Amino acid sequence: MAETANRRIDPEALSRMNAQQAKPLQEIFVQCMQGKVALVSGGASGLGYMVVSRLCEAVAKVVIASRGEERAKRALEDFKAKGYEVSWVRTDVSKVADCYAAVDYTTSAYGSLDVLVTSAAEWSSYSYLDLPEEVYDRVMDIDMKGSYFLGQAAARYMVANKIKGKIVFISSAAQLGEGPKGIGMNSYYAAAKAGVVAMTKTVSGELRQYGINVNCVAPGGMLTAGVFTQGTEAFALYGPEYKAVRDSHGSGSPDPTPLAMNPDEVARVVFALCTPMADFMQGETVNVNGGTLMIKQERPFSFTVPGCVPGPKAAE
């Protein structure tokens, strides 16, 4: 015992051993999804569409779970034109029975379920003083309840079939209590998305014993159709004053970070959490917002570096 305890550890040999055990990146990023089956809620548009695209690019078989048939058919046409193996199941994630039906469809069609991404979401702009109960319920049912029970349905299948799968919940930068500057008006949406973050942590604590990785991505503003429809509804409710404040947000700022990003910027991170890259991640929420929530310096201030304000000072 004493001899073993006192034995000198060779750091170079340990490093070589670790390197030998490491999986090649080709296997992690390219080959890891081949033959895998993924279910993506809200996969017919926005972030979900880009997640489906990335999973298919890695040769996964993907099922889109969404409500609207017309939009889903257009998405299927896009993906199948590229030779991707994709199908659609009509799903209203606010209904628990639909969540379970989506998992049943996926496992019946493809014989497995390895990855779940819950990107279906609903939101709009209402002042806390104005929010109707039915709008609150709709957002909570889709954003929070839908993620919870779709995740439960997927997890039950994975546990029963001893699948060490990946579950990725989608939250939002709103979970930090942030909203459009000068406007806000998304308290109920923020509450739902904060719930998704808490759910990720606690559900992960239960499912890790089965080898299931549960993590979350919290995107900032993205250029999706929902951004424009949500704005139209708010303009009608609150008039030109709302539009003026919204339009002035960020105007005149030299900050190169866009207020809204291509959803593929987020989809790439979601994809990574679906791969062996996330094998040692449990219950984490990854913020992907381009730094838009940071306290940012709006001018390149420096008195030592040329090209900044005020620039190098003369030696005294």
Segments (PLM) and residue ranges:
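Short C-terminal tail/terminal secondary-structure segment
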Residues: 4-28, 271, 282-316
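Conserved glycine-rich cofactor-binding loop
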Residues: 37, 44-45
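Short, small/polar-rich loop/turn modules that mediate ligand/substrate recognition or access, typified
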Residues: 117, 208, 213, 281-283
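Substrate-binding pocket helix/loop in short-chain dehydrogenase/reductase
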Residues: 127-128, 132-140
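A short, exposed helix-loop element centered on a Lys and neighboring polar residues
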Residues: 151-152, 201
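Catalytic loop of short-chain dehydrogenase/reductase
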Residues: 159, 168-195, 200-209, 221-223
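A glycine/serine/threonine-rich, flexible loop-to-helix segment
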Residues: 182-183, 221-254, 265, 295-316
